[in-house]
Amino acid sequence: AFNGQFSHNNDYNRFAVDIAMNVGTYLTAVRAGTVVWVKDDYHMSGRTNYFLDKANVIKVLHDDGTFSSYAHILMDTAIVKEGDSVAVGDKLARSGSSGFSTGPHLHFSVIKNSGLKNIAIPFKFVDHTGTAFTPKRAMLMVGASKP
């Protein structure tokens, strides 16, 4: 859910969602764009401040200037590299638990630049009927790699 109490309480994370999943689950692009950041060289995780900047991350730039961010990916599993174009459903990497993390999950957010500051913005999920919805705490969702 948005505005989480544990770690989603600042401008960069306020509208991020954590999606629990098994280690090694393929992560796929939610929108088309260009890969602008790939970091997948860290293997540890923990809940201390030491781990805040250690998460493995892939960021994709979209035509509207926003970025989608996929964090806590498994070390050495990035399939894409900076400069690659991706389409909806393309495999990016595998899920993990790198950096500031208490277990395997995807930390996903949509980010825009606002006054030289990156901030997370609200986004919607789309169900199997094409209906948009906002995630809620403890909501169970099953994903698909292609719409």
Locations of the language-model features?
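A structural signal for short beta-strand/turn segments enriched in small hydrophobics and glycine
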Residues: L27, G33-V35, G83-S95
